[in-house]
């Protein structure tokens, strides 16, 4: 028959009536009674001891009607209300360790208490000092706040004045720039429109250098007088026109001259030299290059065919300068390479007659 026990640390089994203690090597054991602190060597002896000496599970003769559970609960309540110190066999080393740990715990508990007391004392001193300052110098504090407010107002006023000055300066600069731009436009616009509109039968360079008539309607009085007095309109024009504009004007002049020649001569020379009539009365054009002799129904087809012999590409791209034999090839090139749509004026290279 056993008894209730609870396993815990330090090789001990605690019950509500006794403690089961082991030796350090775990070979010897003893049981200590909680009620009378008597040491017993076996569990049977301890069980008999608590039954005989302390009436556990039996009770006195006049209380035979009580159950064992009631007796156990009464004994447990009595032990809980008046707990007795446990008997322990502790070595000297364990005792020293316990003393050191207990002293360290006490020091750790004292330190926060001392720190809190010091903080409370410092807070009290600070509050007292602030109260003294408020009592002694209330006027000085109000004066300082008033001075600070005045300084802030002055700084704000200065900043506003600086911003206004900067805005005025910017407006003046913008007005000056606009005036300068208008003056430059008045001086340069009449000179830019003095390009000759009629091409004389001379070279392109002579046409550019020839002095045009000075238009003084759109010029100011001072600018017109300066232009008439200096008589340097051709040189200023040459300086104003860039090289690209001169090159384009030369090409346009040559193209117009060539087109005029072709329009006047194609109807006579082409028909006279290469136009033939068949037996059926149908008119056709024959290529007269060496031994070619190909026949074409239209003169435009003959001109395209002649570019094969002359290796001249009449249609040139105005963006990249690539040249083509036919206008359709130029249009496809412009769509694919430059993503341009629609028809524009293509740069025509004059055809060579042979």
UniProtKB/Swiss-Prot annotation:
Q: What residue spans carry the Low complexity bias annotation? A: 264-276
Q: Keywords in UniProt for this one?
A: DNA-binding, Metal-binding, Nucleus, Repeat, Transcription, Transcription regulation, Zinc, Zinc-finger
Q: What compartments host this protein? A: Nucleus
**One cellular component GO annotation, for this chain's record?**
nucleus
Domain of life, per lineage: Eukaryota
Give the GO molecular function terms. Answer: DNA-binding transcription factor activity, RNA polymerase II-specific; RNA polymerase II transcription regulatory region sequence-specific DNA binding; zinc ion binding
State how it assembles.
Homooctamer.
Query: What does the UniProt record say this protein does?
Result: May be a transcription factor for genes having (A+T) stretches in their promoter and/or enhancer regions. Binds to AT rich DNA.
Name assigned to this protein: AT-rich binding protein
What is the organism field in this record? Sarcophaga peregrina (Flesh fly)
């Amino acid at each position: 028959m056993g008894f209730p026990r609870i396993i815990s640390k330090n090789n001990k089994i605690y019950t509500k009536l006794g403690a089961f203690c082991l030796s350090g090597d775990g070979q010897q054991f003893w049981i200590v009674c909680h009620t009378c602190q008597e040491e017993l060597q076996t569990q049977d002896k301890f069980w008999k001891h608590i039954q005989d000496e302390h009436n556990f599970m039996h009770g006195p003769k006049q209380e035979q009607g009580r159950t064992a559970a009631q007796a156990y609960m009464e004994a447990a309540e009595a032990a809980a209300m008046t707990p007795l110190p446990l008997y322990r066999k502790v070595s000297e080393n364990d005792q020293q360790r316990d003393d050191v740990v207990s002293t360290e715990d006490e020091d750790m508990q004292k330190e926060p208490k001392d720190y809190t007391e010091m903080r409370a004392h410092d807070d009290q001193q600070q509050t007292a000092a602030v109260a003294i300052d408020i009592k002694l110098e209330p006027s000085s504090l109000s004066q300082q706040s008033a001075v600070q407010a005045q300084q802030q107002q002055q700084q704000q006023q200065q900043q506003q004045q600086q911003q206004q000055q900067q805005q005025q300066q910017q407006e003046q600069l913008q007005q000056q720039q606009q005036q300068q731009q208008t003056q430059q436009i008045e001086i340069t616009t009449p000179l830019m429109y003095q390009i000759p509109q009629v091409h004389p039968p001379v070279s392109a360079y002579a046409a550019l250098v020839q002095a045009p008539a000075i238009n003084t309607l759109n010029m100011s009085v001072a600018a017109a007088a300066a232009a008439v007095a200096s008589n340097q309109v051709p040189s200023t024009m040459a300086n104003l026109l860039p090289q690209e504009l001169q090159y384009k004007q030369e090409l346009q002049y040559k193209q117009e001259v060539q087109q005029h020649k072709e329009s006047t001569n194609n109807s006579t020379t082409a028909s006279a030299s290469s136009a033939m009539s068949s037996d059926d009365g149908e008119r056709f054009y024959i290529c007269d290059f060496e031994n070619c002799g190909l026949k074409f129904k239209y003169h435009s087809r003959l001109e395209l065919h002649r570019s094969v012999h002359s290796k001249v590409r009449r249609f040139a791209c105005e963006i990249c300068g690539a040249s083509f034999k036919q206008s359709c090839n130029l249009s496809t090139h412009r769509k694919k390479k430059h993503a341009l749509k629609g028809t524009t004026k293509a740069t025509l290279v004059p055809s060579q007659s042979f």
